């Protein structure tokens, strides 16, 4: 189900709790909402749809939403400076990101996974993990 986007900086600045199997439907809604906004958005975190739970969805290289539950960056290299926009905020803001990252997360079956990402996909994952931590760029 496509949900409304939260734009309150106060709500977005609150850290998220860890996701459980009871939160799988939120991940589905998050993927649906990202797909509905894919013309101007490459990733979303659950707090952007009003859920304070650590779930992100990022468009993969094929343009499909990849949902990650409880993502955590476990390796990174190649820091760089960039400017990022956000669907829930106006304008672009400076950010420091890593060119390449490895992320541990759980999939939609709550199985542990590890993935390596680079480029825009890595940048989007870092941005959405910041959302889970209550960091608003």
Residue ranges, per PLM feature:
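Positively charged
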Residues: 1-137
């Amino acid at each position: 189900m496509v949900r409304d986007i939260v734009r309150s900086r106060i709500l977005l600045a609150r850290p998220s709790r860890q996701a459980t199997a009871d939160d799988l439907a939120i991940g589905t809604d998050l993927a649906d909402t990202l797909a509905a906004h894919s013309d101007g958005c490459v990733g979303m975190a659950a707090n952007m749809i009003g859920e304070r739970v650590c779930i992100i969805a990022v468009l993969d290289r094929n343009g499909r939403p990849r949902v990650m539950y409880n993502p955590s960056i476990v390796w990174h290299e190649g820091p760089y400076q960039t400017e990022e926009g956000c669907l829930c905020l106006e304008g672009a803001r400076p950010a420091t990101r890593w060119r390449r990252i490895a992320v541990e997360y759980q999939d939609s079956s709550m199985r542990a996974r590890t993935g390596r990402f680079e480029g825009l996909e890595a940048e989007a994952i870092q941005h959405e993990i910041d959302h889970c931590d209550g960091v608003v760029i």
